[in-house]
A protein has these predicted regions:
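Class II aminoacyl-tRNA synthetase catalytic cores and aaRS-like
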Residues: 1-225
Length: 225
């Protein structure tokens, strides 16, 4: 039965010719079982985590997210996300940026959206605000002698939902540089990283505009505003 947990005791042996299955991790071996015990039984699952086709609707998948995450596609996405984070750390560390986690509970610093407010248990009637961005903290770091800072920052913005997404919580590569002359210095600093991530993880060039294709050494076109 699907999802039953069993304990099989026996001898691991190589599968015979014609019995090997290259599509599974254990496809070259089998267990010659001496004893089989059911440790836990399971009811029929609301969604089938290993079936890529004919999946349940999105609402049901979100309700049983812990099962949906077991799908090979979702597992692959989690691994890609972790690898992307590793690449970002590697790139920024290699350019002498220092990773620093700034506080999550702080005073309000409006940045164009509404704050998520958290009531204080110790100070009645007062609230913490979840950061829309670490703006104030990273500027204080510059004053404190940290000339090149970065983090993969959690940002919280109480914005109205769009048709297909809610912006409430997201993560961004946040950075700050002391004595940067202009925004172009910052763009030039991170441009190679953006190209690398787009090429390696999306399998495509980041942008193709007016025959100027990113990925061939050309700079990303600048759009004024």
């Amino acid at each position: 039965r699907d999802e039953f947990v069993v304990r099989a005791c026996g001898v691991v042996a190589e599968r015979g010719e014609g019995l090997k299955n290259p599509n599974i991790a254990s496809g070259d071996v089998e267990i010659v079982v001496d004893n089989l015990e059911i440790l836990n039984r399971a009811e029929t699952l609301p969604i089938q985590p290993f079936a890529e086709d004919n999946q349940a609707g999105e609402e049901l998948r979100f309700k049983y997210r812990y099962l949906d995450l077991r799908r090979p596609k979702m597992q692959n996405m989690l691994k890609k996300r972790a690898e992307m984070y590793r690449r970002i750390h590697e790139y920024m560390d290699g350019r002498d940026f220092i990773e620093i986690q700034t506080p999550i509970l702080a005073n309000s610093s409006p940045e164009g959206a509404r704050d998520f407010l958290i009531p204080s248990r110790l100070q009645e009637g007062k609230f913490y605000a979840l950061p829309q961005a670490p703006q104030q903290f990273k500027q204080l770091l510059m004053v404190g002698g940290v000339s090149r800072y970065y983090q993969l920052a959690a940002c919280f913005r109480d914005e109205d939902p769009r048709a297909d997404r809610l912006y409430g919580e997201f993560y961004q590569l946040d950075l700050e540089m002391s004595f940067a002359e202009n925004g172009e210095e910052v763009r030039t600093e991170v441009e190679p990283l953006m190209k690398q991530l787009a090429t390696d993880f999306a399998g495509k060039k980041l942008l193709d505009l007016s025959d100027l294709a990113v990925g061939d050494g050309s700079p990303i076109p600048r759009i004024s505003y």
